[in-house]
Amino acid sequence: MTKTALLKLFVAIVITFILILPEYFKTPKERTLELSCLEVCLQSNFTYSLSSLNFSFVTFLQPVRETQIIMRIFLNPSNFRNFTRTCQDITGEFKMCSSCLVCESKGNMDFISQEQTSKVLIRRGSMEVKANDFHSPCQHFNFSVAPLVDHLEEYNTTCHLKNHTGRSTIMEDEPSKEKSINYTCRIMEYPNDCIHISLHLEMDIKNITCSMKITWYILVLLVFIFLIILTIRKILEGQRRVQKWQSHRDKPTSVLLRGSDSEKLRALNVQVLSAETTQRLPLDQVQEVLPPIPEL
């Protein structure tokens, strides 16, 4: 391959690398995921623990609708094994969902990444509630969870369940609570011993720079260093060519002629010298040298 073809290939590789590179540096911005918990069914004889509740919850990153995520929180760890059968019956009778909370997101569902929308993430956390303040199912929760995602991607996820206890039979009759819907827990009591709660969940997701992105940073640095070295080399080669051409131009002719050429140079010098001497002779001497012309 010629130098021109190699240069074109190198330029094409660099352009492709620059175009693909931003895809590897896309990091999910710190955002807030709003989950509106639609309803929770609690039996009248359900009792909470005194000091704290250890719970596990499963998030299905599977679009039920375009902008919806179903999130199921199990306050009772014993129900965790039967979460599929339990939450499948939530649209029907509420026999098996005494501690099942169903939430859906208001915003975009790709709050972690689009590639993980079909995976099931199991998250575990802890929730501490004082016994004397636990007068209703709605409390102020602050807990941290760690999703099980790909090993190349690491996330710190902090969930804040911000709500306020409120009881009403008709939610639309309270305009003051409509303004503070982000921090309001709406409770509606029904005759079938079920309580429907509407919550607001704020989830801040922060991305940590992983080894993959560090590798790409190093590759970018190496490419730039290579380009700088190549440019400096081309500049130095051009300067060397100019200096070499000037040195060849300034060399005397006698240095370039060798062997038989030196003899020709000496003969040439002798002829030039004799011509110069004859030109410098006076006119009388020139006449003496010339022979007389015979008369006809």
From Swiss-Prot:
Residues 26-211 are extracellular. Glycans are attached at N45, N156. InterPro entries: TMEM156. It holds the Pfam family TMEM156. The chain crosses the membrane at residues 5-25, 212-232. It is a multi-pass membrane protein. GO terms for cellular component: membrane. It comes from the Eukaryota. Keywords: Glycoprotein, Membrane, Transmembrane, Transmembrane helix. Residues 1-4, 233-296 are cytoplasmic. The keyword Glycoprotein applies. It is found in: Membrane. This is Transmembrane protein 156. It comes from Homo sapiens. The gene is TMEM156.
